[in-house]
Amino acid sequence: MAAASEHPAVAIAGLEGGYGESPVLHDVSLDVHAGEIFAILGKNGMGKTTLLKTVMGLLPARSGRVEFLGEDVSGWPAYRITRLGVSYVPQEKSIFQDLSVEENLRLALRDVSGFAERLERVAEWFPILKSRHRQRAGTLSGGEQKMLLIGRALLT
């Protein structure tokens, strides 16, 4: 395999997917390079979330390829993709309301060694993650819950 720097960070080729018999994604192809700022725009129901969920292994693709840094992850389950250090912050809140902020953050990690140091770095952007680490996540405001989700993605 060639060095990772020779590959786009994300490469999608001919991706097809949807829900049941309803096709949503039709031959989607794109490359996103490391450091590039990229946005997916469109009206409601156009497939933005379906695309992200399919790329992340949360929905099965009907056909096509997805690669992260040259590694073909087509057909991989989401937990295996996250082990590559790839994260996704969903538009719907996916926190565990009854767990603490810290417990929600730890869920993203397969290896919790160095958690305190990593949390310190993320808390530079989102201090609430440290100051309220024992608080039940369900008691956070909507904006604070979004910070928790972004922090969890950054920790992976």
Where are these regions (language model features)?
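Helix-to-loop junction immediately C-terminal to a conserved catalytic motif
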Residues: M56
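Conserved ABC transporter NBD signature motif
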Residues: G64-D72, L84, E117-R118, E124
